[in-house]
């Protein structure tokens, strides 16, 4: 068991006025980190106009681990996301914290996608974060947290790849579920007659062999 500070340094993100946003270089925003445990360049939709110096100061590299810095509730503070792809001229928002290995990263990137979202790490995150009007964490707080991992990167990668495969399966079934819900919604409109008396008392779609108007009762 090791403290996070043994391997990672943390940096606060970029703060700019709203007129700088909308075009420019990609930026890792709060919602990107909050909703995804792993990030690839094509997932980043936010853009910000910056100088070369600012891009250098707030650059994003493959393997960087981000944490949401603030939240409305304490249970949603410090959600993690790791950079899985190779970003180009990409920066990160002031609403997230960037963790980066000081030298050689002891953890596989796929493994990092999950190790900072385990129940034990989440519990520690909640305990060591502050709560006033909003929940808040910091690089200083995260560096004091403990993390456990196998020394073998091969084992780490197998764990990460296995869990990623489950996530992919869940996402596939979720898409199928969403499609079924939309299909059901469409059939509800087609297979039931309208209660509007000005419309025909017939559904637009019926099973073969059934005829006649539907009864309209008050």
Pin down the residues of each PLM region.
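Non-catalytic DNA-recognition/assembly elements of restriction-modification systems
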Residues: 1-14, 206-218
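A short glycine-rich beta-alpha junction/loop motif
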Residues: 15, 89-95, 122, 129-155
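Short, ligand-facing micro-motifs at secondary-structure edges
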Residues: 34-46, 65-93, 110-114, 123-127
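Short acidic/His/Gly/Ser-rich catalytic and metal-binding motifs that mark active-site loops
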Residues: 35-40, 136-138, 198-200
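Short, well-ordered beta-strand elements within core beta-sheets of diverse protein domains
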Residues: 51-52, 97-103, 144-148, 205-210
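Amphipathic alpha-helical segments with low aromatic content
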Residues: 145, 152-217
């Amino acid at each position: 068991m090791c403290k996070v500070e043994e391997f990672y340094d943390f940096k606060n993100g970029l703060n700019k006025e709203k007129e700088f946003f909308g075009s420019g270089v990609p930026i890792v925003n709060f919602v990107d980190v909050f909703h995804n445990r792993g990030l690839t360049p094509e997932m980043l939709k936010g853009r910000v106009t910056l100088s070369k110096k600012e891009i250098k100061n707030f650059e994003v590299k493959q393997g960087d681990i981000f944490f949401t810095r603030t939240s409305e509730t304490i249970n949603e503070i410090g959600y993690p996301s790791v950079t899985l792809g190779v970003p180009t001229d990409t920066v990160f928002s002031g609403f997230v914290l960037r963790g980066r290995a000081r030298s050689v990263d002891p953890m596989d990137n796929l493994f990092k996608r999950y190790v900072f979202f385990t129940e034990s790490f989440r519990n520690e995150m909640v305990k060591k974060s502050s709560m006033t009007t909003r929940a808040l964490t910091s690089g200083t707080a995260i560096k004091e947290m403990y993390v456990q991992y196998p020394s073998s990167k091969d084992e780490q990668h197998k764990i990460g790849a296995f869990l990623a495969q489950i996530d992919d399966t869940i996402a596939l079934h979720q898409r199928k579920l969403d499609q079924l819900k939309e299909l059901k919604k469409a059939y509800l409109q087609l297979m039931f007659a309208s209660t509007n008396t000005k419309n025909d008392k017939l559904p637009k779609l019926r099973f073969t062999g059934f005829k006649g108007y539907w009864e309209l009762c008050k």
